[in-house]
Amino acid sequence: MIEANILLIAVAVLVMAALYSTVGHGGGSGDLAVLAIAAIAPEEMRPTALLLNIVVSSITTWKFVATGTFRKDLFLPLVCASIPAAFFGGYVEIPSVLYKPIVGVVLLFAAIRLFVPTRGTEKTKQPLLYIVLCIGVVIGFLSGIIGVGGGIFLSPLILLLGWTTAKQTAAMSAPFILVNSVAGLSGMIVDRGDFPVDLSFAMPLALAVVVGGTIGATIGSKKLGHQGLRTVLGVVLLIASAKMFITMNSTPNPPQSDTVKSTS
């Protein structure tokens, strides 16, 4: 029974990795959904999801950066601001009754905006540095609070602001998620004093997301055009939003306090 459950979870996270990696995402929110449905304890869910996020975002970073659409000039100030903010946000506790609804509303709004046809073309504009830094801090802090890599917030924002094209958005999101996920997991290791992931459980899942992430990142980096990436990203965000609302009242093995301590 245990082996069968792990197999089902592995198949589910493989699908999530394939879907999310198409747009340069690591699939952290999707992995959390799968683990929540599988009734994995919260203290195991977040570090496991972050580890899987690191695996997938490593693949998507390699695939999308190789397309030549990576914006280093925009990426560096974003991560310089987001990483320390994500560390700080990871130690902030919020009421569990507010956690999923807040994220669900944010993702739903972003998805709807992405389905609205754009008026312009693939032209982009150069943002002011202080605005980039402020957005990096906000996204990092928000990601730290809710426990994700931040791509679900970064992608629609920089695309809708006209800072990046669809391809550039995917190439930016992948390494952004990678560094923030590493920061989050590192923070957990420091906080707990040991490696917080059960490798006997996580390794089969990691192998599954390698397959899914490679498939999705290959398709996304080479096959899909501008509107295709916008559509897929919108679908991904809708799925993540629906997941937040559907699982609002399903908290497996709840912790003693009525708060969610996130891990960035």
Can you name each region flagged by the protein language model?
Residues 1-21, 30-38, 42, 62-142, ...:
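Juxtamembrane transmembrane-helix boundary motif
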Residues 23-31, 147-157:
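Transmembrane helix boundary and interhelical junction motifs in multipass membrane proteins
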Residues 40-51, 71-74, 163-174:
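Membrane-interface alpha-helices at helix entry/exit sites of multi-pass transporters
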Residues 48-63:
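Transmembrane alpha-helices of multi-pass small-molecule transport proteins
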Residues 49-53, 173, 177, 201-206:
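Short hydrophobic/aromatic, small-residue-rich stretches within specific transmembrane helices
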Residues 59-62, 66, 145, 149-152, ...:
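Membrane-embedded alpha-helices of multi-pass transport/permease systems
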Residues 168-187:
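Hydrophobic alpha-helical transmembrane segments of multi-pass integral membrane proteins
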